[in-house]
């Protein structure tokens, strides 16, 4: 929750532009592996925070944009089980995770459950903007165009809040792993371009650069290889492959923890629905998308229903430090000094 408090401070400040820049997946461990410690980001790294749990884009960026925790918005993980249509639906895509077909469940997915902070500020007559990738209305196809828009806003506004999100280096790490030249070169290029862009700003502007979560290279386990576990499941796996929601048939609920831990206890922490909701989500009410148990990854494995689903080389949403520790990078561009401090 501390990260939301930091964002609230940025939103409530006055007398300068405030930019919250979210680089997807750029956790502290990723920075350590891919960036030079004397580079721009490290020079301005002032602190670290714990990511919102689950440490995943659906939960974190929705919280960043609305100021509400995942239990309040219902946006908890990449895929969630909906009893209305008996589907596990990819929240941002409104697509059945296991068939690839579009879902009929339109009331929850694709639409934020409440106004964004930017919308609320605009309703109050305050200056606020979102700068997003192409998947959002008015979003940008390239990183350069995205950065240009941020610079443009900072040079035309003097007291505005700007939320800016970019989906890298997350995608590059999913596809290639962390310890690979592709995400390394990409993140270093992004760092250099951000430094250059901030140098073009002439108005007093404060930047907070952070991430939604970190990343960890992974290997895979499949429920289809464990028939004694598969027979216990009432619905297919949902939420995240490293934060797995498990709906269990009533007759297996009592013995499921022992059975699960026999196979996966070395790599996952199994908690009850109530424990996950209260201890990890800090929820004030039960959440219908959470099954009887949740399996939290503590090692290098993820847990998937079948081997024919999308396989990622690096992932997140577990509870390892690599996934949970995110940076707080603070940069002040001051008009009266004309340099970055």
Regions found by a protein language model. Give the residues of each.
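Feature captures the catalytic ectodomains and active-site-proximal regions of enzymes
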Residues: 1-341
């Amino acid at each position: 929750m501390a990260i939301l408090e930091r964002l609230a401070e940025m939103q409530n400040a006055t007398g300068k532009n405030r930019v919250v820049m979210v680089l997807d997946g750029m956790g502290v461990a990723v920075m350590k592996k891919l960036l030079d410690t004397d580079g721009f980001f490290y020079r301005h790294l002032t602190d670290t925070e714990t990511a919102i749990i689950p440490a995943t884009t659906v939960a974190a960026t929705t919280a960043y944009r609305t100021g509400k925790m995942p239990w309040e918005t219902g946006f908890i993980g990449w895929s969630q089980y909906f009893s209305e249509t008996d589907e596990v639906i990819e929240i941002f895509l409104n697509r059945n995770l296991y068939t690839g077909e579009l879902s009929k469940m339109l009331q929850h997915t694709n639409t934020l459950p409440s106004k964004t902070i930017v919308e609320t500020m605009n309703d109050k007559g305050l200056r606020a903007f979102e700068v997003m990738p192409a998947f959002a209305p008015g979003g940008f196809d390239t990183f350069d165009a995205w950065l240009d828009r941020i610079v443009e806003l900072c040079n035309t506004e003097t007291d505005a809040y700007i939320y800016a999100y970019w989906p890298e280096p997350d995608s590059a790490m999913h596809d290639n792993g962390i310890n690979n030249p592709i995400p390394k070169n990409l993140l270093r290029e992004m760092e250099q371009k951000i430094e250059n862009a901030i140098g073009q700003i002439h108005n007093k502007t404060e930047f907070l650069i952070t991430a939604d979560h970190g990343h960890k290279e992974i290997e895979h386990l499949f429920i289809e290889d464990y028939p004694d576990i598969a027979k216990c499941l009432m619905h297919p796996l949902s939420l995240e492959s490293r934060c797995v929601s498990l709906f269990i048939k009533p007759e297996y609920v009592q013995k499921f923890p022992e059975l699960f831990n026999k196979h996966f206890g070395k790599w996952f922490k199994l908690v009850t629905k109530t424990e996950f909701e209260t201890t990890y989500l800090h929820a004030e009410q039960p959440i219908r998308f959470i099954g009887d148990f949740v399996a939290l990854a503590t090692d290098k494995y993820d847990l998937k229903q079948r081997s024919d689903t999308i396989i990622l080389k690096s992932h997140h949403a577990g509870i390892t430090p690599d996934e949970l520790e995110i940076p707080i990078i603070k940069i002040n561009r001051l008009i009266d000094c004309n340099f970055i401090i």
